[in-house]
């Protein structure tokens, strides 16, 4: 068990957290990545934070800045479903393809957003999903590591009300009453991860993700939704973002991707086959929904929704769709992905045995035809789907 004193906030951490607004989080995350890119600085945090108990140094993988084309990948293929229908009806239709193992007490992990966040999944879509498919389902969340509208349970509940979630459902802030440790099978950085205690009360998990960019992860898909989103606000998220570096945001690039992925592995391993993944490619700012109203304007066109029982295949399919867009449409989001070395999310998930980076993309709009990512985005233009709330 990780000693509490090794992961608790110090008094200085608490002061820093109070001063860390979501806007500053986005700015400082970018500065941390830029600093790491300077000659001689890329492994500064790792040099002070990656010693194993036996004294050997742990080393993060490389190559996270490089996108691997489909033809260069090897291994089995998973199934990924795809629809262009960005609506409540489209969400229901694609959910039906992956719902078979979701039973008992079902949790729905999604990003409920900072106050007035413009890009989060529309509440009317989620309301219809709950009412028509998951009437006993519960949205789960955790408090944030950075200061803002969700870093305490009290503020988080206020933000849930502001953003319209409490008008039709309740949200379980799973770390409001404490934390629990989950094992990380075959982890390099962790043997355990700290998560919200209440998550363990659920039998199955639907991962409902707004796919978009991310200040530190490059992109935020199902991996980020679980890896950061299920880690509790005070212990788990600090384990990922800071490690033993002594800095609130001391971990970045490939090491950050690996730590986040190991956190996800803890959650996925806990639920075993009672888990499914849906990624909504809509309003894809280069910034995460953590940025709230300060997120960069959306310039990447909306694409559609993917769903799979394979977390890696789901995230890989979204990345492939972005890369299949015309250069002028994908430029900003691709730059964010590559500058943060985000492809290490994908290659590390594969290394950890979490899924396949090859898949059959099933077009449920056209008789379940198997298509390529290029065919999925053919004709996509700069569209904006309104929230409808």
Where are these regions (language model features)?
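N-terminal and secondary-structure boundary signal
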Residues: 9-13, 17-389
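Cationic, low-complexity basic patches in intrinsically disordered or flexible, solvent-exposed regions
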Residues: 4
């Amino acid at each position: 068990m990780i000693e509490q004193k090794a992961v608790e906030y110090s008094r200085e951490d608490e002061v820093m957290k109070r001063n860390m607004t979501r806007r500053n989080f986005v700015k400082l995350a970018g500065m941390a990545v830029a600093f790491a890119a300077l000659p001689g600085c890329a492994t500064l945090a790792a040099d002070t934070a990656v010693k194993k108990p036996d004294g050997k140094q742990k080393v993060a993988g490389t190559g996270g800045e490089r996108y691997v084309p489909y033809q260069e990948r090897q291994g089995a293929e998973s199934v990924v479903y795809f629809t262009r229908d960005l609506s409540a009806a489209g969400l229901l239709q694609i959910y039906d393809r992956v719902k078979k193992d979701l039973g008992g007490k079902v949790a729905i992990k999604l990003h409920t957003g900072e106050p007035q966040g413009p890009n989060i999944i529309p509440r009317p879509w989620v309301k219809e999903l709950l009412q028509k498919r998951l009437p006993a389902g519960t949205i789960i969340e955790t408090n944030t590591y950075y200061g803002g509208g969700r870093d305490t349970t009290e503020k988080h509940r206020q933000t849930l009300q502001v953003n319209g979630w409490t008008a039709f459902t309740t949200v379980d802030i799973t770390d409001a009453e404490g934390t629990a440790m989950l094992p990380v099978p075959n982890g390099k950085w962790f043997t355990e991860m700290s998560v919200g205690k209440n998550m363990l009360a659920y039998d199955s998990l639907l991962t409902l993700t707004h796919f978009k960019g991310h200040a530190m992860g490059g992109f935020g898909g199902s991996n980020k939704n679980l890896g950061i989103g299920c880690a509790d606000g005070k212990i788990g998220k600090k384990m990922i973002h800071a490690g033993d570096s002594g800095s609130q945001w001391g971990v970045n690039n490939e090491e950050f991707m690996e730590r986040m992925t190991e956190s996800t592995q803890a959650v996925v391993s806990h639920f075993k086959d009672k888990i499914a993944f849906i990624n909504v490619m809509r309003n894809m700012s280069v910034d995460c929904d953590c940025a709230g109203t300060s997120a960069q304007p959306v310039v990447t066109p909306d694409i559609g929704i993917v769903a799979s029982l394979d977390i890696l295949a789901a995230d890989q399919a979204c990345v492939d769709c972005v890369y299949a867009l015309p250069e002028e449409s994908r430029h900003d989001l691709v730059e964010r992905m590559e500058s943060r070395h985000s492809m290490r999310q994908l290659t590390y998930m594969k290394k950890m045995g979490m899924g396949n980076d090859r898949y059959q993309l099933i077009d449920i709009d056209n008789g379940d035809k198997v298509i390529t990512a290029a065919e999925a985005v053919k004709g996509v233009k700069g569209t904006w789907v309104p929230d409808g709330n």
